[in-house]
Amino acid sequence: MEILLYTGLGVGLIFASEIGGYIWHRYGAHTDILPFVKDTHQVHHTRIHDQAHGDFFYIAILLVLYLAFLFYLYYLTYISLVLLTILYLGVFFPFIWSYYIHSAYHITDHWLNDYEWFQNDKRIHFKHHEDPTKNYGIATHFTDELLGTFDYAFPINKNIEK
């Protein structure tokens, strides 16, 4: 029974991470709530080969703070190390996946360009660069579909294939 609980928690955290990434991208990187983040992100939108390392740097800082919070929680409550690990990895791995996929979108000769699913995701991503009110998802777009910001229309810039 414990394995089901931990599995459910891990899957839930993956979904929560994706929703958190959407919120960060939509409201952190595209509004004036955090102007320094918006400024960094706008540079990314104007350079096709900019991999947005600055944006991900801020998120990496949040991951370190989250880990510190979990250890503090562990210290206060003595929750199991298994649970602590799931709570961290369920957020950490989706971040790493998003970072990798997003960087690959901006690398001309990336090996993933050989796959149609990646080419489609890349088009969706670059559509966001043309219309910053659409397609906030990075590695998945279920949150965009859920919240009405998904647009599959291909971007005008056809120079993104490879």
Model-derived segments and spans:
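Cytosolic/stromal cytosol-facing helical appendages immediately following the last transmembrane segment
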Residues: 2-8, 12-58, 73-78, 83-84, ...
